[in-house]
């Protein structure tokens, strides 16, 4: 299965092309330039280099959030359009899951953290079950200190590891918290290849959507009140 993976949820946006589990090409830039101006330019470059055309993809995988409203809107709108025109399915993938999926840590609980800017973070918790990661509760946006204060109740004494592309953002606060013994693992901010692989896994489980059903996973500040319910 040939996959085009798109991530516009963070400043380190990326595109990747996969043939089954094999990554054929990746484009990523971390620049102060809007996604609306660079996404299609980078896509054109990647497809030209690989000599592939949009109709030749079997699946589009896209980061559906959490992330900036503007960035997510650009990526999701593009994927919606391609899927509708070419009649292809979509895998909507969590960016936090893509971060957690890169971890080499052996702890049963993984806590991915992404910079949400303005003094806040996006955070969540994933549990290893049967060779895959399953989300434990809701993904949230709040200050790091608030997030760390809420973790003990959900972790319930289980070992956990923090996973993030920006360790400098959380390392000091973790060291001052009751989780000071927990590892902080650094992973890549380039998420498109991982999003592609997670999208393939979702396709195998039949967890796909069409262009009409695709929606962004925006997290509002008030969602903090719903932390890990459900």
Which residues does each predicted region cover?
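Surface "functional belts" at beta-alpha junctions
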Residues: 22, 34, 89-190, 218, ...
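N-terminal beta-alpha supersecondary unit
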Residues: 1-66, 189
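DPxDG-like acidic metal-binding loop motif
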Residues: 61-92
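A glycine- and small-aliphatic-rich helix-loop capping segment at beta-alpha/alpha-beta transitions
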Residues: 20-23, 76-86, 128-131
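Glycine-rich phosphate-binding/hydrolytic loop that grips phosphoryl groups
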Residues: 185-216
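A general structural signal for well-ordered alpha-helical segments in protein cores
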Residues: 36, 40-43, 79, 96, ...
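Stable alpha-helical structural segments in soluble proteins, enriched in small hydrophobic residues
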Residues: 46-50, 85, 103, 195-203
């Amino acid at each position: 299965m040939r996959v085009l993976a798109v991530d516009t949820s963070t400043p380190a946006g990326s595109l990747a092309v996969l043939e089954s589990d094999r990554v054929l090409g990746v484009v990523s830039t971390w620049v102060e330039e809007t996604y609306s101006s660079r996404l299609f330019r980078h896509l054109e470059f990647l497809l030209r280099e690989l000599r592939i055309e949009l109709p030749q993809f079997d699946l589009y995988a896209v980061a559906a959030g959490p992330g900036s409203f503007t960035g997510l809107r650009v990526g999701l709108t593009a994927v919606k359009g391609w899927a509708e025109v070419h009649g292809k399915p979509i895998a909507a993938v969590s960016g936090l899951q893509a971060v957690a999926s890169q971890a080499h840590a052996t702890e049963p609980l993984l806590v991915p953290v992404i910079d949400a800017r303005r003094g806040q973070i996006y955070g969540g918790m994933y549990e290893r079950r049967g060779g895959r990661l399953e989300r434990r509760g809701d993904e949230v946006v709040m200050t790091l200190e608030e997030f760390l204060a809420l973790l003990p109740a959900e972790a319930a004494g289980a070992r956990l590891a923090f996973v993030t592309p920006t360790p400098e953002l959380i390392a000091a606060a973790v060291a001052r918290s009751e989780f000071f013994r927990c590892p902080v693992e650094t992973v890549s901010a380039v998420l498109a290849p991982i999003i592609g692989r997670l999208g393939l896994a979702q396709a195998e489980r039949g967890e796909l959507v069409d262009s009409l059903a695709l929606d962004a996973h925006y997290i509002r500040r008030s969602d903090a009140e719903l932390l890990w319910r459900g």
